[in-house]
């Protein structure tokens, strides 16, 4: 079996090396060598394992979320869960070495301490980690996610954390009930005190330090969760960036946790919140498409902002296209797509 030498450079210049056969994904080959690179869906839909090929040739399935031709600048981007090598490779990873694991992701037990319906079909779930060999603290980077095992199944589901690291072991999520969703169906009958198995933290959708550039956060429905985590960390650290939030939903009744955003507005004096509702709005929300709203604001922005976007593949691609058209460098658009 032919194997090719793979050399991967993390953003902070650390080097990872592993062999990979031509019928094995780069992600699987790394894991076979106990190098666990950030990933999520493993089917090519979420984009969490995107990397860039510096030298060499790969065979790669196109991202399932976007069948348009890649621009020349993005032509070397690959999904590590889909790409297989056809030569030795040098690849660049868009995250620091600290996000690479060399041992299995911790699995822990957590107890449901609160479960509230905050909008039609949307739950606010609060868990408390059970004390174990890791202690009881919840340690993670703002913007990361956890996987939760659906009770009675072998299926894990990924949900972004909306709170920040804490000693009490608290994990908070907002979760949409979808018709085909196993975990949302479970939540309909869940009870306080139920114990769930969780795995993480995972993910590299985190705040980046680029000086005092303005930060614009764009969240589609429950995609607001990791952005709330980032905003809370900014408030805790007293960061003074000009910051703007675009909270996009279909209907006004889909807006939730507005009290949390109001609290953050009090703690972050430079924070501006824009709620964008596709359907006709009556209570002060902006009626209109979030992409068009973003477009108008970018046209008058004094400097290009750093953009953080989380939501559907369509939203992420739409934001990416629009902000880069206004001169925001692609590398300063940070995103996380919902898995499909």
Regions inferred by a protein language model and the residue ranges of each:
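Reductase modules of NAD(P)H-dependent flavoproteins
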Residues: 1-83, 89, 241-340
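Short, surface-exposed secondary-structure boundary micro-motifs
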Residues: 54-57, 94-96, 151, 201
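A short, basic/flexible loop-to-alpha-helix module at the beginning of a structural domain
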Residues: 200-211
């Amino acid at each position: 079996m032919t194997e090719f030498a793979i050399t991967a450079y993390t953003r902070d210049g650390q080097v990872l090396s592993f062999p990979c056969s031509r019928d094995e994904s780069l992600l699987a080959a790394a894991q076979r060598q106990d190098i666990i690179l950030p990933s999520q869906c493993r089917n090519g839909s979420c984009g969490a394992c995107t990397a860039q090929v510096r030298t060499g040739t790969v065979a790669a399935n196109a991202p399932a979320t976007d069948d348009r031709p890649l621009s020349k600048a993005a032509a070397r981007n690959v999904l590590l869960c889909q790409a297989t090598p056809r030569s030795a490779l040098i690849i660049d990873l868009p995250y620091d070495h600290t996000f690479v694991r060399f041992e299995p992701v911790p699995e822990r037990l957590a107890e449901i301490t609160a479960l509230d319906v905050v909008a039609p079909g949307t739950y606010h779930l609060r868990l408390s980690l059970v004390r174990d060999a890791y202690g009881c603290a919840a340690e993670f980077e703002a913007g990361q996610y956890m996987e939760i095992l659906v009770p009675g199944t072998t299926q894990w589901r990924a949900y972004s954390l909306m709170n920040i690291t804490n000693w009490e072991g608290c994990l908070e999520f907002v979760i949409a009930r979808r018709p085909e969703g196993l975990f949302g169906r479970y939540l309909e009958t869940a009870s306080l005190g139920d114990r769930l198995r969780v795995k993480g933290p995972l993910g590299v959708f985190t705040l980046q330090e680029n000086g005092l550039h303005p930060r614009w956060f764009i969240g589609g429905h429950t995609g607001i969760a990791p952005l709330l985590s980032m905003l809370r960390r900014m408030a805790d650290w007293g960061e003074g960036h000009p910051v703007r939030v675009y909270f996009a939903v279909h209907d006004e009744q889909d807006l939730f946790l507005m009290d949390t955003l109001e609290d953050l507005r009090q703690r972050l004096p430079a924070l501006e919140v824009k709620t964008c509702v596709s359907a006709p709005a009556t209570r002060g929300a902006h009626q209109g498409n979030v992409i068009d709203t973003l477009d108008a604001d970018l046209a008058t922005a004094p400097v290009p902002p750093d953009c953080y976007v989380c939501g559907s593949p369509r939203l992420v691609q739409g934001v990416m296209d629009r902000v880069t058209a206004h001169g925001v460098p692609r590398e300063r658009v940070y995103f996380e797509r919902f898995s499909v």
